[in-house]
C-alpha cells in the first residue's frame, strides 16, 4: 500500500504529494509516441449553460437540451482535461520524455493565452474552472515529482505553466471560500481539492492551509449518521452525490497526511462515517431511499471512474475484503479529475 513518501512536519518543509506521485515509471521502453492535438486555449468568459437548467431546487433532473449545450460550450476545456490526463497516464507507464514535453508545450500555450482566467459569469463557469484546475494540477504533479525529472527539459515553460496554475488557484479560492453553509456542497469540496493539488505543485502553504480549512468545513457538515444534508436535497441523486462529494475529500486527506497533517479525525471521524454510509449504499441503496423518501439512481456504482476514490480510501485505512473485491474487479480505476490512474498511484504493486 502506497501512502506517504516524505513528511513535511514544519512550516519550512516543501510540500509533497503521496508516494505514488513520486514513483519511477512502470517501465522504460522506447515506445513510439505522437503528441495529440491540443484544443485551442479557451479565453472567453466562463459563462455556461447548466445541464440542470429548468430543474427545481433539487437540481436532480437533467435537461437534455441544456446538457447538450453545456457539453458543446465546454468542449475545449474537457478535451484539454482528457488529453492531459491520457498523456500523463502514458508517461507513468513508459517514462517517455516526449510525453512530458507534449504536456508542457500544450499547457504552455494555454498559459501564455491566459486561458480560463476570464470572469466566471455563473456557477457553472466557476465549476468548470475548478474542475479543470483539479485535472491539470493533479496530472502535472506526476511530472513534477517523477524521479526522472522530465520537466527539467523545458524549465522556463514549466515555470510559466505553474505560474498560470497558481493564478487559477487564486481565482478558485476567491470564488469558493467563505460561502454560506447552506451553499457549501460537493462543488466546494472539489474546489478544495483543486486548491490542494495546486498547493503541492507550487509549494504554496497558503493554498495548502486554505484547502484544509475548506476540508474542515466539509467534515463538519457530515451528520451523526454519515449523511451530508446538502446532498440529501438532490432527491433521486442523493446517493450519487454523496459518492461524488467524498472523492475530493479523500484526496485532500491523503495529501494532508503526506505533509504531516492528519484530518481524518475531524468532527469525530466524519470522513469514516461518510465513507461507511456510502459503502453501505453500494450494498443496498435503500438506506438513501429511506432517508430521502425517493428511490435512488445507483447506476453509477457500476462505473469504474465513480468508485476510483476507493483506491485512495484504502490507502488511508485498511479496507475489508468486500471493498477490496469490488475494487479489484474493476481495476485499473481511473478518474481524470483526481489524477488519472489511481490504481497506479495508490494501490499495492
Cite the ranges covered by each PLM segment.
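Long, repeat-rich segments with strong aromatic
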Residues: 202, 206-289
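N-terminal signal peptide c-region/cleavage motif recognized by signal peptidases
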Residues: 6-11
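Sec-dependent signal peptide recognition
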Residues: 1-3
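Extracellular glycan-targeting catalytic surfaces
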Residues: 12-181, 189, 255-258, 263-349
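Extended amphipathic alpha-helical interaction segments
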Residues: 161-192, 198-205, 213-222
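Catalytic-loop motifs flanking and including active-site residues across diverse enzymes
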Residues: 79, 132, 187, 191, ...
